Amino acid sequence: MFPMVTEFMNYGQQTIRAARYIGQGFMITLSHANRLPVTIQYPYEKLITSERFRGRIHFEFDKCIACEVCVRVCPIDLPVVDWKLETDIRKKRLLNYSIDFGICIFCGNCVEYCPTNCLSMTEEYELSTYNRHELNYNQIALGRLPVSIIDDYTIRTISSSPQIKNG
């Protein structure tokens, strides 16, 4: 009869322990109930990117001297620089410049080491397409300035919504 009493006491202790664990989990759940949602409705709401966000690369054709520093510092030798040597003035003339964003890792080395600052990172991050060949941008596509998220009146930015507080 004595082992039956100890089993009943163990069963009671296990029941109390299980109820305590369930109560702790429920308290954590309730502590999150008064917080605002963290998710955003993407096509209609967008995050404002940070100041040093590394998005699509902007290229200024007139500033480029075809030195190919961007190609040398790129870990995957990505930028394609076509140039022609002008023999009368002994300088390179840039013919074509392109970057394939399907391969680019957005490390920012090309922007950082460019001696003429003809490359810069933009806040544009919507580069998805159905055809991977559309991600190969030439100097005309790279020269296009992106529309700022803040200036787009059709989109509500996250900074205009209530602040998310960490509980």
Swiss-Prot record:
Pfam families: Fer4. Residues 55-84, 95-124 form the 4Fe-4S ferredoxin-type domain. It is a peripheral membrane protein. [4Fe-4S] cluster 2 binds at C74, C104, C107, C110. Its cofactor is [4Fe-4S] cluster. [4Fe-4S] cluster 1 binds at C64, C67, C70, C114. It comes from the Eukaryota. Belongs to the complex I 23 kDa subunit family. NDH shuttles electrons from NAD(P)H:plastoquinone, via FMN and iron-sulfur (Fe-S) centers, to quinones in the photosynthetic chain and possibly in a chloroplast respiratory chain. The immediate electron acceptor for the enzyme in this species is believed to be plastoquinone. Couples the redox reaction to proton translocation, and thus conserves the redox energy in a proton gradient. PANTHER family: NAD(P)H-QUINONE OXIDOREDUCTASE SUBUNIT I, CHLOROPLASTIC. This is NAD(P)H-quinone oxidoreductase subunit I, chloroplastic. It comes from Jasminum nudiflorum (Winter jasmine).
